[in-house]
Amino acid sequence: MRLLIAALLLAAPLAAQETTESREAGLAAWDRIFEKVSHPRCTNCHVGESGQPMWNGLGYGADTVHGMGVLADETRIGALSTPCRTCHVTTGRANTVPHAPPHISDAWRLPPVELAWLGRSSAEICAQMRDPETNDGNDIAELAEHLRSSPFVAWGYAPGAGRSAPDGTPEDIAADVEIWGAAGAPCD
């Protein structure tokens, strides 16, 4: 009986999620979200356990591992090798010099291992993003807030001179996450 009660308590947050949007609207929002999170500007840092940021699909020539022997290791900041902040300084200045190391108003680092998107399918990333165990502990509202407020996300949409970016703005993807969540976060 205790096991049944525990299972019901664990399932309650998903069951309690109000679905105010249609499944079709949620799937359309997910398609727009995936278009953004699968862009190389995002996947080149969302690399998972390899800890090696990439320079893929950005118009710099052949796809390759980030230069300078960068390895994020378990710290995600490269503390055991070349720290990200060796080149990616923390500053609020605009990124105006083409191909210079980008900078933001936060300490440069890779996302947590659980947020690996490089080489993953839409269904895999969808399952990751809807599960707090694999999305850095966020519910839908917290995901949307992260997308609106993260200096990393803001930089990804406006990376500066000579750099490609996904279409839209942080507000666009945050609004789509809210629609997707209101539809029950459907994946297919």
Show where each model-derived region lies.
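N-terminal, post-signal-peptide region of Sec/Tat-exported proteins
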Residues: 42-74
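N-terminal export/targeting leaders of redox proteins
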Residues: 1-34, 54, 70, 94-188
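The canonical Cys-X-X-Cys-His
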Residues: 38-49, 81-91
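Processing junctions and N-termini across compartments
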Residues: 36, 78-81, 120
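Mid-chain, structured segments of secreted extracytoplasmic proteins
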Residues: 61-102
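Intrinsically disordered, low-complexity regions enriched for glutamine and histidine
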Residues: 15-16, 44, 64, 86
